[in-house]
A protein has these predicted regions:
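Regulatory and interdomain segments flanking nucleotide-handling catalytic cores
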Residues: 1-108
């Protein structure tokens, strides 16, 4: 998305496929979150994420305007700390258990 660090759906899905493949080969870990940002614009959400997540975490948006975040090299044991930080910044977080296509909801 122009003016943000948020990837368009097609580019985000490419990154998600890559992370998923590496996880399947036991070469990397990640957690996928769907983020709601009820009191922010998309640009404000992007700015808040810049302060809350690491440089190597990947954000993307679906055609429906849903915001997703790939937390790279993260496992569930560290998730409570990350979720608390994001929720404190005004996000509503939903962990996605399976790799999903951000547009159709189909499993990859």
């Amino acid at each position: 998305m122009q003016g943000t660090r948020i990837l368009k759906q097609e580019y985000f899905e490419e990154r998600l496929y890559s992370f998923h493949s590496m996880r399947e080969e036991n070469r990397a870990s990640y957690v996928l979150l769907k983020l709601e940002y009820p009191k922010m614009t998309l640009e404000e959400a992007d700015t808040a994420l810049q302060a809350s997540v690491r440089e190597n975490d990947v954000r993307g948006i679906s055609e429906k305007g849903e915001l997703f975040l790939i937390l790279s090299q993260t496992d569930r044991s560290s998730l409570p700390i990350i979720l608390a930080r994001l929720e404190n910044d005004g996000f509503v977080c939903h962990e996605i258990d399976t790799v999903e296509n951000a547009n159709t909801g189909e499993k990859l």
